[in-house]
A protein has these predicted regions:
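Structural signature of tandem-repeat unit edges
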Residues: 1-8, 14-30, 40-53, 63-76, ...
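Consensus positions within tandem repeat domains that build extended binding/scaffold surfaces
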Residues: 12, 33-35, 55-58, 78-81, ...
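Short low-complexity, flexible loop/linker segments enriched in glycine and/or proline
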Residues: 129, 423-424
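Short acidic, glycine/serine/threonine-rich loops at helix termini
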Residues: 376, 420
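A structural signal for leucine-rich repeat
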Residues: 399-401, 421-422
Length: 433
């Protein structure tokens, strides 16, 4: 059998005519992505117990494979690993498994018998989509070890069964449900669980929920009512983005973290009585429409994308209490001409001022030690930047798309000066001018 192997990684199997039964050699720890792609001659496959990971699409379109013996040490089956293995009829997932990736067994149309360890909850979305097992599942709620993997029913009003502790990724995604009551037994709702449910109007959450993950209610454009219990400590990235009718929100008392764009485009954010959403001294979002913005004195961190695309702002003023400006904080503020930066700022995040096309000059204080990637990318009018001599770390393409006239000023030779010259931007030492 022809295997390409390097340092315990099976990189590729070269199919040989007439070989139907494949035994992977002992000592292999990883089967690399696409290693057996379209090996349609294989009917049975056995792997040694040394294998711990199967890469993305590793056995995709092995359409005649009927039987697979998995390693008893296997921890990770990556996305699409067995997609379109159309003759596979059964699979035994070993006790060692930690994660099964997105669509791992999708379109294994004859797969009817699936054995999963009793304590396994690391199941991603659509893992068994369009398999015989999923189609024949006797209940509308497909529940595996207290994990609600998928809802396949047609009811409009949903009450989550008491057997469910975790609502899985994409469990209700793009369905026509209109209302959901989550039981007190549910402890976790995973990312994108209800994304794209465009007819969903109301949701009742229990006090057992501590976190709403990324994109959980993404683009639920009819959602009008949801209670956020005080038990919630974190609302993730884009959790309610696109919920245009969501107007009545009371943030939980114990909320510690509000993700980037978590309520973007919502009626609540647009009608907020305050210009700012601030949680634990982090300015998470700006809701106002002022041309000159004074950042409140209690803010120490300007969060990721807090002012993104606020293209009516001309001037920003911040107090010296601010120590961090997050990723994309002022990205797309196309009218911004002037910004007063905190004298105690330490970190300037990725793309912080990307596409601030009216900004002509800016001074970065000596307190700054770290700058992320593309901080000033496509700032077409920016011709003068004063940089800190204490910067120790600078990301990639900070000045990408800069004006030909751009000149960077520093007080003395330093890391920032070397970085600037290396990227073919003019640099001048202030003391020598």
């Amino acid at each position: 059998m022809a295997f390409e192997i390097e340092d315990g990684v099976l990189k590729k199997y070269i199919q040989e005519e007439g070989i139907k039964d494949v035994v992977i050699p002992d000592g292999i720890s990883v089967i690399e992505s696409w290693a057996f792609y379209r090996c349609k001659g294989i009917e049975t496959l056995s792997m040694p117990n040394s294998v711990t990971r199967i890469g993305q699409s590793a056995f995709k379109w092995c359409s005649n494979m009927k039987e697979v013996k998995l390693s008893e040490s296997l921890a990770h089956i990556e996305a699409c690993a067995f997609v379109e293995c159309r003759n596979l009829t059964s699979i035994i997932i070993p006790q060692s498994i930690k994660e099964i990736g997105f669509e791992a067994f999708r379109n294994c149309i004859r797969l009817a018998d699936i054995s999963v360890p009793n304590d396994f909850i690391g199941l991603s979305s659509q893992v068994f989509e369009n398999t015989r097992w999923e189609k024949n599942y006797p209940d509308d709620f497909i529940v595996i070890n207290n994990l609600l993997y998928r809802y396949k029913g047609n009811e409009k009003s949903i009450i989550i069964p008491d057997s469910v502790k975790i609502i899985g990724q994409f469990a209700f995604a793009f369905s026509d449900i209109e209302s959901v009551m989550v039981s007190d037994y549910v402890e976790e709702i995973r990312g994108s669980a209800f994304c794209g449910c465009k007819k969903l109007v109301s949701v009742i959450l229990p006090d057992s929920i501590k976190k709403i993950e990324e994109s959980t209610f993404y683009n639920c454009e009819s959602l009008e009512k949801i209670n956020l219990p005080d038990s919630i400590e974190e609302i993730g990235f884009k959790a309610f983005i696109g919920c245009r009718k969501l107007s009545d929100i009371k943030l939980p008392k114990n909320l510690k973290s509000l993700g980037t764009k978590s309520f973007k485009d919502s009626a609540w954010l647009k009608s907020s009585n305050s210009d700012f959403i601030i949680i634990d001294n982090v300015l998470s979002a700006y809701c106002g429409n002022k041309k000159v913005v004074n950042i409140p004195e209690d803010v120490t961190v300007i969060g990721d994308a807090a002012f993104e695309d606020c293209n009516g702002i001309i001037e920003i003023r911040m107090s010296d209490k601010v120590t961090r400006i997050g990723n994309g904080a002022f990205s797309g503020c196309t009218a911004l001409e002037k910004i007063e930066i905190s004298k105690n700022l330490i970190i300037l995040g990725h793309a912080a001022f990307r596409e601030c096309q009216a900004l002509k000059e800016i001074s970065i204080p000596e307190s700054v030690t770290e700058m992320g990637n593309i901080v000033f990318a496509n700032c077409k009018e920016l011709t003068s930047i004063k940089l800190s001599t204490n910067i120790e770390q600078m990301g990639e393409q900070i000045f990408y798309g800069h004006a030909p006239e751009l000149c960077v000023f520093v007080k003395k030779e330093c890391f920032a000066a070397k970085y600037t010259r290396r990227h073919k931007v003019k640099c001048k030492i202030l003391g020598s001018i």
